[in-house]
A protein has these predicted regions:
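N-terminal signal peptide c-region/cleavage motif recognized by signal peptidases
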Residues: 15-17
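Domain-level marker for long, solvent-exposed, non-transmembrane regions
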Residues: 20-210
Length: 210
């Protein structure tokens, strides 16, 4: 009975905190929406590949992020100065995957250097091959986890265009993708195999996408 009462008390304490966090997230997303719409209209961006209005697409985007809560991540892909819109779209998709992979690789490298160098590990020499392999494999694995949200295009006025493609990824799914990349990258690195448990811990940690 005592445990039950303690459990109820814990739930009562946690619930208001979760609700406050959700409201804070909602306010943040609303502000981002207003800022983005103002920016897009000012710079002449148009929605690409959708029958919806840009306003609706952006509202839907932030609604998806809100529903995912802390598990939702936005990933941006950029393509510049292209003439074929289809080619530009593929460039933006590839850029999103490459950007995410580079951020994932940089995060793990930073953690290895800061946490393991003090243990006498020569991070640069021992992990050099691993970093490159890990980024390459994350780029491959994350592509299947990115869900396209909306895409905008800008006419440069000289026959070329700029494109920004926005994707949403679930952090839990992204973590699994990074783990798959780690498992394969470790095959190319004796150091990653030797320190597998520690490196796996770094890979599982989330990081802020830019």
């Amino acid at each position: 009975m005592k445990r039950f009462v303690l459990l109820i008390m814990a739930i009562c304490l946690i619930a208001p905190n979760v609700e406050a966090q959700n409201k804070q997230l909602e306010r943040k997303l609303k502000q981002e929406y207003k800022t983005k719409m103002k920016e897009y209209k000012k710079e002449g961006w148009k929605l690409f590949g959708s029958s919806h209005s840009l306003d609706v697409a952006l509202l839907t985007h932030y609604d998806k992020l809100k529903s995912l809560g802390e598990d939702g991540r936005e990933v941006l892909g950029i393509a510049s100065r292209f003439k074929s819109k289809n080619v530009g779209k593929q460039m933006a998709i590839n850029n999103a995957c490459v950007t995410y992979a580079q951020q994932a690789g940089s995060y793990v490298k930073g953690r290895v250097v800061s946490d393991m160098a003090g243990d006498g590990v020569d991070a640069d020499a021992e992990f050099d091959n691993f970093y490159a392999a890990y980024e390459r494999l994350v780029e491959k694995e994350i592509k299947g986890e990115l869900s396209e949200s909306y895409c905008i295009i800008h006419d440069n006025g000289d026959g070329t265009f700029e494109m920004q493609a926005y994707f949403i990824v679930s952090e839990s799914a992204a973590t699994k993708a990074r783990i798959r990349a780690l498992e394969n990258a470790a095959k190319e690195s004796a150091a990653a195999q030797r320190y597998a448990e520690k490196v796996s811990e770094f890979v599982r940690e989330g990081f802020e996408t830019e």
